[in-house]
């Protein structure tokens, strides 16, 4: 929802919430004030409405004496808010005349103006009925208002003097007729920034503002009844178009011109707009290419020189920026508002119903929002997939006048560009998980042209690709890069993209191959942004990247480069280094490069880590739904959702890394399991850690903002407090007998942590940082800062002395200073004491109780005070930057190592809570790593789970009744492969996924939801599940099946776990059966992995009934043949299923009986005919008439062993393509083959 802003109301709030007669009387008295008689000869002046700033309440303090006799710095006392204040000018004859001579008929709702009364009065009764006004700060904005505002708004228009009864449900922003005039940009800027000198703009609801001059232009605001987004149902039903889910209520931002007719005004504007911006009709890029051109660059816009010559300074300032980021939504700062022009304004209107201003600005269509709502509206555009550019004022109006006087326009420049993949502001980040922006580059396998390679290797490289990638989480500043060689199917790229799932991708135009491009887009996050940039000029090559790093001076010297950057450049990894260059260009364009690259948080990414962790490739991550489900792409029901119980944001991001790379080494797994056991038993330690971690903010992201100097002061204080909490934890754990990884992580805290944290304990006034969001250093810390503070105190003392003098002079102790908008330190004097006011004092405001003045000396001191505070504000910002720089000096040596340790401990707590949450039964897995004593090679793997449940079903269940458990045993005493058959929907796929999930949990160091678990460490899980085609990647169902199967055959080892579901069903029955039989034999005999093959080919089991490493399994069911009802028991038993029972499932789905009966007859005939043909062929091939079937796999193996390369994994060997084919595996091959022969003979 949009940030709600209190709306300025032209009427008082009444307790009953309705427009009572008292309210009308009050409004009448307000209007009659403007029509009172003025002595003749008084020069007439225009009636000015207050700026937004003058409509706010300013809390003030009473003047008190210092107990030590000195003067206190508090110069203000509270105002009596029962006084009703009204708006006026020094003279009002023009208004009186306009009202009396108006040619337009008056509305029935208009109030009569009493032109004979010299002064307007308001009764106490009126005031008593408007108590809800008290102590409310008033801010005018385009967009929001309170629900309790009156339904009717009365607006006095200039010249005509007509009071308009507004029935609009929108807020409107109405500048003066000259505001935004193309010939008066300077004044336009000045008026937008009025009120900057004071944070609040007045302490009364309706203030008598007597202007000194008539030349200044003011904005008039027309606010009408409109609910705040926080308090109104966004999807309310009205006559307008239906709101979108995130759509804010209708708003308008309408510059007003004092034309006689709104229709003629709008028509005139539209005509001028069309004439001046005719070149926007046929959009072209900066090189004048039309949209139809393949090389069209949507980021730029061509503006003809004739248009440039007609632009005002303000227009030039805007279009200079907008033309270079035509694909961005540009928020342009104007005073206390951000404005959208032309295409951006129209888009805002179409998407979010932000109203288009009727009169525009400088002939540009516009919509506007208050500056305080920028983050909300920027986030709305970003969620819709747009980029947002923020153009801010680099100086205040006062600073501009101090710099060059009244000439010129306020400096503005592009502050930042916000995109969904590169957000750094904590308020705009809605997830604790990392969001990545990735740059990718592709080159052919022979890119490096290595002449020393033999011809066969060169031919192989022609079928490979080289990829370079670099990706960054801009919120933390962590940048990772890599270069890798991939196969023709881009297997590794698929894995990388599945792990990273970037929100934004930068790629060189026409660089990626068709397949790589499809993989990148298919595996990126939903609504990801894809940026195609120019080769060389924007996506830097290796040499250009090096030159940019040197010229931009991210690092002091070349020796100061991060190790991975230095290594890539020195070793000639040009593709990876160029990928970093592509990312560097994009960060420069976003104006993030200085802050992020200089952090030196650059590492090499290893997406496999095969030596230290289990490998989960991209297909497996998708098939097992590790991070996102296949239903809606969220994490509901995923394994990550089960494990994501970390307390700190850093811990949640670390947990994702842990889950991508489960442990592989037995000692590492056991150590983590010991830690989990320790935390499960030591409740006190757990509570201590959890309480401490719950107090920690997102330190990793805050450190990045400290480095970029964008952190808020109060957040900087939070960082120091958080590290103080950490050293308290460290101190309290000194005497604890910590076990496992907890002890390892606690001891990894840097030695200088305590000293570094204590040096910041008293660096500045902490409480002021929390309460006032300012840094006040200890006296003597900064000389310039001390001088500035002394100057402000000196001015306050002088003002205090003058005030005390005035009190004595007027013999009135109630004289005080008041701030009202940009007029600060105005002298407020009770009416009873104003008769002695000197004639040279200038009256600034008045009500029935007080009048406010400026004397010459106070006006001068007030101006000096404003300038002093402006200078002090700059010093405060500079001081914060220097403090951030000092803190950031220990980023890599102290702060980040500490955060890493905390994140790891938090992950241990998360695994502990997951283990506790599994319910009963659950157990600690037993890890067994068997090695051949003679050859020191790993023996074949095995696993055994008793009464295993799927952990993502019925989370937190306390009994096993909620899910039907199953025993799973592969390897060791049982065959390594299970050939699983059964009816459709009987639970085969669930069994397959459940086995894989259990293995991952065990190697994560977590308890497993079963009665007992014993397994060897599994090096890789590979899956072939489902029968979906892949339109995004241009692959058919059968192609997807075979491509995934090839990866299994290439990468699997005797310690891998394979899951293959219904291989071959994408092709014809004969082709599919042949492929399934061949693959199963090769895996069972030569690769010797653990795994399951689920199939509906009933005869496949008979082909392997003699194979010692294939075990037939089935899912049990109960069948009622009469009604064709099937009861699924979800229990896995040994044996072969009687069939797939497809007709029964069809009946359960409601297909008509006639169709099912016909299908059953056809199926019976087909099965009978197929069996007769097979038996006849077998009999014809047997001389003795006996039907003996020799498996095709056995025949092939003997041919290769006898006539090929024998027991080798060469092209003609029996184990062709097998990754690991050592002597133990070869011995098992021979055992299997001879076992099959023995069974055939028997």
Swiss-Prot record:
The PIP box serves as a PCNA(POL30)-recognition and -binding motif. It comes from Saccharomyces cerevisiae (strain ATCC 204508 / S288c) (Baker's yeast). The modification Phosphoserine is found at residues 102, 145, 150, 201. The keyword Phosphoprotein applies. A motif (PIP box) lies at residues 27-34. NCBIfam families: PRK05399.1. Heterodimer consisting of MSH2-MSH6 (MutS alpha). Forms a ternary complex with MutL alpha (MLH1-PMS1). MutS alpha interacts with proliferating cell nuclear antigen (PCNA/POL30). This interaction is disrupted upon binding of MutS alpha to mismatch DNA. The keyword DNA damage applies. GO terms for biological process: interstrand cross-link repair; meiotic mismatch repair; mismatch repair; replication fork arrest. Residues 166-190, 198-207 have a biased composition (Acidic residues). GO terms for cellular component: cytoplasm; MutSalpha complex; nucleus. This is DNA mismatch repair protein MSH6. ATP binds at residues 982-989. Changing residue 988 to A: Impairs ATP binding; reduces catalytic activity 13-fold for ATP hydrolysis. Residues 1-271 are annotated as: Disordered. PROSITE patterns: DNA_MISMATCH_REPAIR_2. Residues 18-37 have a biased composition (Low complexity). Residues 228-299 bind DNA. Inhibited by Cd(2+). Pfam families: MutS_I, MutS_II, MutS_III, MutS_IV, MutS_V. Component of the post-replicative DNA mismatch repair system (MMR). Heterodimerizes with MSH2 to form MutS alpha, which binds to DNA mismatches thereby initiating DNA repair. MSH6 provides substrate-binding and substrate specificity to the complex. When bound, MutS alpha bends the DNA helix and shields approximately 20 base pairs. Acts mainly to repair base-base and single insertion-deletion mismatches that occur during replication, but can also repair longer insertion-deletion loops (IDLs), although with decreasing efficiency as the size of the extrahelical loop increases. Present with 5330 molecules/cell in log phase SD medium. Changing residue 337 to H/I/Y: Partially functional in a mismatch repair assay. Keywords: ATP-binding, DNA damage, DNA repair, DNA-binding, Nucleotide-binding, Nucleus, Phosphoprotein. Residues 1-11, 54-69, 103-121, 220-233, 245-270 have a biased composition (Polar residues).
